[in-house]
A protein has these predicted regions:
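C-terminal interaction surface of TIR/SEFIR-family domains
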Residues: 139-141
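Beta-strand-loop-alpha "switch" segments that mediate conformational coupling across diverse proteins
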Residues: 87-92, 103-134, 146
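C-terminal alpha-helix
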Residues: 145-155
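Nucleotide-state-sensitive switch-loop elements of NTP-binding domains
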Residues: 1
Length: 155
């Protein structure tokens, strides 16, 4: 498929490729073909040094995370896998979200696990001000989490 070729060729020229499967699914019905999914996944797994899987606490995202984690357990993957939980809410409910996330991904023995909090106030302020998180709220939880990940990745 042309999309798989594009991704494979791009992988030689860039450090990161981010693919939103939700957008791909709805943008081109022909991409729902199982052969395309298999070719796509095989191509990504062959060239990726690091594979980051993003998931939110939402039901659809949690289901997809369980499915992909199960599929990965049956495959040989060259790169390191990092799982990232996004939109974790603070407090007891957030602890429950994180616990569910960890119960799904921990058996896979990933390279790293990351958690990004839900920080609507900071994101809304940055959006409204058309600024970056650092400028809108330098002490926000999301900005601090992103800074910690960036620091870890650059050391």
């Amino acid at each position: 498929s042309h999309a798989v070729e594009l991704i494979f060729n791009a992988s030689h020229n860039v450090d990161f490729i981010l693919i939103d499967l939700g957008l791909i699914t709805y943008s081109e019905p022909a991409l729902l073909d199982r052969r395309w999914e298999s070719a796509f996944l095989t191509s990504v797994l062959e060239v990726a040094d690091d594979l980051w899987i993003f998931s939110s606490p939402r039901v659809v995202s949690s289901r997809a995370l369980r499915e992909i984690t199960k599929a990965f357990s049956q495959m040989t993957i060259r790169g390191r896998i990092t799982y990232l939980l996004t939109q974790r809410i603070p407090g007891k409910r957030g602890d429950e979200q994180e616990e569910k996330f960890l119960s799904v991904v921990s058996p896979a023995r990933p390279h790293a696990l990351r958690i990004l909090p839900l920080d609507l106030r900071s994101v809304s302020a940055a959006t409204q001000d058309r600024s970056i998180l650092m400028e809108s709220n330098s002490r926000g939880a999301l900005r601090r989490s992103l800074a910690a990940i960036a620091l870890e990745l650059t050391q």
